[in-house]
Amino acid sequence: MQRTYCPRCGGKLEKRMHEGRERDWCPACRVMHYDNPVPATAAVVLDHRLDLLLVRRGQEPGRGKWCLPGGFQETGETPEQCMLRELAEETGLQGRIRGLVGLEMGQNPFAGEVLVAGYCVDAVGGALCAGDDATEAGYFPLERLPELAFRSHARIIERAAAPLRPRRRFRGLPGGAYVVTSLDHLAVAREACRGGARIVQYREKDAPAAQRLATARAIAAVCRESGTVFLVNDQLDIAALSGADGVHVGQDDVPVEEARELLGPGKIIGVSCTSLEQALEAERRGADYLGVGAVIATPTKEEYPVVGLEGLRRICRAVAVPVAAIGGINLQNAAAVKESGAKYLAMVREFQEDAAARVAAVNTIYKK
């Protein structure tokens, strides 16, 4: 900010070099004045599809362009209070702060240098409606954002989007083989990745926790090297500690929302379903994909009702998220299961031997 007179005594200021910068100096009261950035906040609000909430600015700077909800911090309020107030004023939404994304510097032609604190915020109430100096409010895919008003906001978005890569990458994953490990889990995972598996799920319930974690970490490393999605069955702690891309849970396990709360917004969450009702509910709760089965009677899923190809077809038509079919699938019936709408074919026994070749065979079905 440009100053002419001393705010202490009213005397005329002079420019002096001090500590490597040109600063305002008052010769009357012999005080050096320092410029400090103005504090502001910005909210990163994502919906269950990972679309980002933006508002269109109704005034300068950046009038007509889009930005994150936020604004300048007022005296007497904390940055967190400022963030929630601005979110409510500009979008009509009530928020709950998940955490700090980071701090970025920006320039404002009226306020000078601005220190922007970006927060990840969950929308927990209210109705979306533009207000205050925002003329519009809406959600946008991270891959197709409109022109942004502030570079500081763009950098905050980049920071917030980085941990979301597993879920974002999962959206573009091609269909094919979904390998559920058994027996020698690491060996199966290695062969699965060598054959081009789309997804590897580590399912082990009987080994000691320390052994399960060590195995999961080893599989995670193999999957990272090959670019294969790695999930852990049921165990959120093992998934988090091993660096897995996500977790697969059953109907009686931790709900999707709580799993998301524990693992963070970037992890993939799949849910087992045996009926259309369960599938629709899991999708509503924010599941990234559905594991549907048993499609055909199988000894590894004896406690599950048989969904059948027609039941699988109904579910695939009713939901927007991808479906992984499981239960009784082998290379002989894989094509028929794929034709029912399943994006992934999940198998256990079929991949216990010659996993690489059988994975490649399944993927070939999806290329036809």
Where are each of the predicted segments found?
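Glycine-rich phosphate-binding active-site loops on the catalytic face of alpha/beta enzymes
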Residues: 204, 251-258, 291-303, 338-365
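Catalytic cores of alpha/beta
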Residues: 230-245, 274-286, 318, 324-325, ...
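Conserved N-terminal beta-strand and adjoining loop/helix that marks the start
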Residues: 28-52, 72, 103
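Alpha-helix-loop-beta-strand connector modules within alpha/beta enzyme cores
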Residues: 213-231, 251, 257-274, 305-325, ...
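Glycine/Thr-rich beta-alpha phosphate-binding loop at enzyme active sites
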Residues: 240-249, 271-317, 358
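Conserved Nudix-box catalytic region and its N-terminal flanking loop in Nudix hydrolases
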Residues: 47-89
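Unchanged
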Residues: 73-97, 102-168
